[in-house]
């Protein structure tokens, strides 16, 4: 396991402390979330099950014997645990590098507490070095791309990739994201946009940050 993975794994272990006994919890998508799923395997008898933010996560949860629930069949979730691509000190994030941003945002919004787990490289002063994913309806791809150019970004179509919802992803490079909440709302209002990967309206409540010295820093 490389150093970055060790930091992710340490944060994932700490996140178990936030899982209520007997609960149905929300589980995210991606390499860091996978470390959390590995940790869940140790306590699977203590929880009722999980709501997954992607088909990949659902498959992984089922493989370790955790029951996966449809979000429509459960109420508010006590906690959602997921990673991020970038996070700032206000706990605003860029997410969706794995393409599951819409379902991640839905499950996060359905949860009382959002625990973000990350290695220290993900904490940044300003969001935007990581390209911002935007999920778009296929027929609106070019329209949305032109609007994103007017915002100062350089959108790139993620070719040969389709989301779990049957849509496309534009990865937007070089956006100046000084006001994440305003940028999120501006992009989400564009016709044809399902959602963008800015999580400012539904930011994290707690950041568990794996450090290179083996510790996990808690930021709230």
UniProtKB/Swiss-Prot annotation:
Domain of life from the UniProt record: Bacteria
Keyword annotations: Isomerase
Enzyme Commission identifier(s): 5.3.1.6
Keyword Isomerase on entry: yes
Active-site residues, record numbering mapped to chain: 104 (proton acceptor)
CDD domains for the chain: RPI_A (cd01398)
GO biological process, one term: pentose-phosphate shunt, non-oxidative branch
Record field: catalytic activity: aldehydo-D-ribose 5-phosphate = D-ribulose 5-phosphate
Binding site for substrate: 29-32, 82-85, 95-98, 122
A UniProt-annotated Pfam family: Rib_5-P_isom_A
Cited function: Catalyzes the reversible conversion of ribose-5-phosphate to ribulose 5-phosphate.
Protein name, per record: Ribose-5-phosphate isomerase A
Gene: rpiA
């Amino acid at each position: 396991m490389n150093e970055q993975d060790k930091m992710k794994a340490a944060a994932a272990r700490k996140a178990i402390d936030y899982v209520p006994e007997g609960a149905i919890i929300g589980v995210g998508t991606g390499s860091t979330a996978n470390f959390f799923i590995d940790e869940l395997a140790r306590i699977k008898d203590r929880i009722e099950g999980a709501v997954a933010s992607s088909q990949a996560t659902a498959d992984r949860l089922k493989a370790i014997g955790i029951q996966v629930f449809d979000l429509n069949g459960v109420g508010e979730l006590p906690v959602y645990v997921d990673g991020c691509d970038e996070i700032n000190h206000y706990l605003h994030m860029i997410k969706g590098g794995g393409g599951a941003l819409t379902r991640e945002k839905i499950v996060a919004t359905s949860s009382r507490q959002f625990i973000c787990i990350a290695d220290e490289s993900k904490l940044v002063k300003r969001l935007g070095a990581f390209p911002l994913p935007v999920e778009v309806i296929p027929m609106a791809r070019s329209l949305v791309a032109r609007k994103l150019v007017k915002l100062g970004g350089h959108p790139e179509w993620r070719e040969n990739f389709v989301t779990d919802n049957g849509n496309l992803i534009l990865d937007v490079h070089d956006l100046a994201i000084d006001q994440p909440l305003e940028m999120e709302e501006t992009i989400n209002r564009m016709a044809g946009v399902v959602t963008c990967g800015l999580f400012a309206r539904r930011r994290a409540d707690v950041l568990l940050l794996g450090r290179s010295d083996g510790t996990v820093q808690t930021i709230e």
